[in-house]
Each structure stands twice: as C-alpha cells, then as structure tokens.
C-alpha cells in the first residue's frame, strides 16, 4: 500500500485510483501475492496458518470453540472482500485518477521493492516448507511442542475433521471476492449506490 501511495503522489483515496496495473506492475504483483496469502489461498502461507486455527477451533468440544470457528469464517469472508476490493479499485477498475497522478506515476524504487520481494517469497513458500510442523505427524517438532499439553490434543481431531467443514472458509473466501467484484461493478455503473462518488 505504501508503494502505491508513494507512486501516486501520496494519494490515499481508492476511489481516485484505478487502471494502474500497467503503471505499477511490481506493486500489483506484490499486493496480489500478499492479498492471496492474507485470505488463505491454497498452498500459500496464510492457507496453512489460517485453516489450522479454524479447524482446531471447530473441533474443540465447546460452544466457545464453535463460536470462534464461525467468527473466524466471517473474518475470512470480510478479509477476502476488502482485499479484492483494494485490488479491483486500485489496479483493474477504470481509472478515476487525476491526470497529474497518472503522468507522474512510478513503481517502487529498489529500496522499497527488495523488502517486498523478500516478504512475497516468504508468503509463497514458508507455509509449504513448514506445514508438517502444524498439519501432520511427520516431524518431532509437531510431536514435541504442539501436543505436549493434553489440552492441545484437540489439534489431532482437526486432522480428521469432515472435509465439507474444512472447505467452509475457502468457499466464504471465494464468495467474498466475487461479491467484491460484483458490488464494485454495480457501484461504478450509472445506478451504483454502494460506493458512489462524484469526481470533481
């Protein structure tokens, strides 16, 4: 987000952006990777960390566990909605930006791009290479840390939870992204009322 603000002359209003995918390609790729990891896209880091928390909450035999699970699922939906709203409004939607912002737009300089690339690599690969520590029985780390306490044995139940229940967060994530796209298209049409904004 900082790279985008910096590249568009400190503009922070999403409604005054749009159409910057060709002007800020590196920023677009980094924000896309970060957003996908944040919403728990399969096989990215956020997928492993988010889903294991929700599954453990679901299999905890208490009303608090069930409430926590559904609250987390709602959070996954909201996260997907606002993350993809950011991408659509900033990069993909028809531009509503000031002419000066477009003419002077520039992608992130090297000193800003390098840390983003390091974080992007971590977002893509860290969850995959560390997944056994959280999702399986194949490593001493899993056996010696997570299940040391009797209370943490519920994480074993999460391994064998119903697939249909495990897929709920993923479906809500997809629903959030689709609704974001539909509402943005609606709002920028002549009858849009959700994010209606008249540029001056």
What are these regions, as identified by a protein language model?
Residues 78-85:
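Residue-level signal for the membrane-embedded core of alpha-helical transmembrane segments
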Residues 34-43, 126:
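Transmembrane alpha-helix interface/packing and boundary motifs in multi-pass membrane proteins
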Residues 7, 47, 90:
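Conserved catalytic core of Hanks-type protein kinase domains
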Residues 36, 94-96:
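Acidic glycine-/aspartate-rich tracts in secreted/extracellular proteins
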Residues 1-14:
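Alpha-helical multi-pass transmembrane bundles of energy-transducing inner-membrane proteins
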Residues 4-5, 17, 54, 87:
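Hydrophobic alpha-helical interface/terminus motif in multipass membrane transporters
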Residues 16-29, 48-75, 97-200:
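Membrane-interface segments at transmembrane helix junctions and kinks
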């Amino acid at each position: 987000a900082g790279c985008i603000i910096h590249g568009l002359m400190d503009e922070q209003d999403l409604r005054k952006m749009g159409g910057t995918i060709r002007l800020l390609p590196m920023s677009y790729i980094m924000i896309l990777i970060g957003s996908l990891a944040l919403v728990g896209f399969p096989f990215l880091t956020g997928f492993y960390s988010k889903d294991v928390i929700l599954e453990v909450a679901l299999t905890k035999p208490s009303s608090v566990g069930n409430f926590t699970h559904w609250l987390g699922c709602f959070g996954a939906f909201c996260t997907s909605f606002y993350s993809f709203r950011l991408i659509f409004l900033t990069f993909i939607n028809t531009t509503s930006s000031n002419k000066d912002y477009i003419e002077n737009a520039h992608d992130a300089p090297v000193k800003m791009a390098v840390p983003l690339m390091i974080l992007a690599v971590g977002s893509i690969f860290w969850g995959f290479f560390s997944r056994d520590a959280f999702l399986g029985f194949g490593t001493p780390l899993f056996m010696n840390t997570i299940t040391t306490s009797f209370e943490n044995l519920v994480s074993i139940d999460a391994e064998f939870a119903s697939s249909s229940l495990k897929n709920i967060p993923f479906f809500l994530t997809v629903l959030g992204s689709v609704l974001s796209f539909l509402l943005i298209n609606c709002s920028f049409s002549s009858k849009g009322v959700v994010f209606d904004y008249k540029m001056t």
